[in-house]
């Protein structure tokens, strides 16, 4: 990845990190998960850092330092697109979603396979999914996040890049809050911290996506 792109990917993450320091894949139709993030008090520094992280509007277009990196990305994109075809039949829509997810997950320091697994469990890859708790979109982001760290417009959570950006930033926040403990962070993301059912579902889904070339 080029220096400029890498700087953009890492710069926003450093801001909120600094603040926080004080088998084969089977895609099945699932209802949106009923669990949801819980609104918790945020220190002003954390709120500001998270707001800066979601506000950066750099386009999700990857740049690579070498031909090998670019070829690896293209192989991943092709394999992921093929696996996602049953859920997203239109090729341009599928590719745009995957390109955006790859960018936003890498930007937040997350594995694309983990984010794909979370989206699979949370929404079944449905852009306009709404849970019983009111969580929205691919990553089932609760509307209060738009008020806490966004511009207050919760309808934007149905926009692909906005939803994936918020979801990735929130998961990164929970990971940092839990000292890197993925099970606890995933539980917190779903509003079921300390229980294993939801994290195990996400990690199981991640294994399928991790097998991509």
What are these regions (language model features)?
Residues 5, 34, 61-65:
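Charged, low-complexity surface segments at secondary-structure and domain boundaries
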Residues 2-24:
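N-terminal secretory signal peptides and thylakoid transit peptides that target proteins
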Residues 56-213:
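Catalytic glycan-binding domains that act on GlcNAc-containing polysaccharides
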Residues 25-27, 132:
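Sterically constrained small-residue positions within well-ordered secondary structures
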């Amino acid at each position: 990845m080029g220096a400029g792109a890498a700087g953009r990917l890492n710069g926003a993450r450093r801001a909120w990190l600094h603040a926080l320091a004080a088998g084969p894949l089977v895609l099945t139709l699932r209802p949106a998960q009923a669990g949801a993030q819980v609104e918790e008090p945020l220190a002003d520094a954390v709120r500001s850092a998270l707001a800066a992280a979601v506000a950066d509007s750099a386009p999700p277009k990857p740049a690579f330092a070498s031909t090998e990196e670019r070829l690896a990305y293209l192989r991943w994109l092709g394999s992921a697109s093929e696996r996602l075809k049953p859920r997203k039949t239109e090729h341009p829509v599928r590719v745009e979603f995957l390109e955006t997810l790859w960018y936003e997950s890498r930007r937040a320091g997350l594995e694309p396979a983990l984010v794909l697994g979370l989206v699979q469990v949370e929404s079944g890859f449905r852009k306009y999914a709404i849970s019983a708790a009111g969580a929205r979109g691919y990553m089932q982001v609760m509307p209060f996040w738009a008020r806490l760290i966004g511009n207050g417009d919760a309808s934007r959570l149905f926009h692909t890049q906005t939803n994936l950006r918020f979801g990735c930033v929130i998961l990164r926040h929970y990971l940092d809050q839990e000292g890197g403990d993925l099970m606890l962070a995933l539980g917190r993301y779903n509003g079921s911290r300390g229980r294993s059912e939801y994290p195990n579902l996400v990690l199981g889904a991640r294994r399928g996506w991790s097998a991509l070339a």
